Amino acid sequence: VKNNAEFENVGQWKRAWYYSRDNENMHQSVQRESKAARDSAGILDASTLGKIDIKGSDATEFLNRVYTNAWSKLSIGKCRYGLMLNEDGMVYDDGVTTRIDENHYLMTTTTGGAANVLSKLEDYLQTEWPELDVWLTSVTDHYATASICGPNSKKILKKLFSDIEFNDQNFPHMSFKNAKIGGIDCRIMRISFTGEHSYEINIEAKYGNSLWEKCMDAGKDFNITPYGTE
């Protein structure tokens, strides 16, 4: 709101659509935001994405069944994009799922599809595969997420997390690291939805505003620009 966001209704959320400046129309705002993210750095509030915590000794097998791609060889600390289909073969939802531990995953879904995906997964567990040892918990509103993208995103992350090496060897694409910011636990995922070098920072929801302000402060020398989903 403080950054003059225009919102759209998505599922149960109001999500920043674009940020207008100086009487811009939507097209002009989107062009400015896109150019900033391409030339230097942009920041997106990705908190509205659905998040489902998946635990249990059969969690990997469960993912193998609900996604079109395989999950058995995904290493701990890695992320993978997954595509979920309906029983008629049509796309139902998609998102990135992260392997936190041997029997622990964090699935992300589309904002509007989060409740329906959770319901479908619970239905599968209760009616189709009751023998599987899997527990699902909706954690969408437990975490706030700031996504920083652009050619200067790595420099901004380095200012926020000076103890982490953000080179490709130590922090490759589609991986995550646990970290602390201001003494608060958080999780950094190197995931890109823009085609640019990007990182997502997940933190307990009550610290979301503080995280955003820290990111904006760290990125001010790089003209970090809030951008919406449009």
Describe each PLM feature range.
Residues 1-230:
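Glycine/proline-enriched, intrinsically flexible loops and inter-domain linkers
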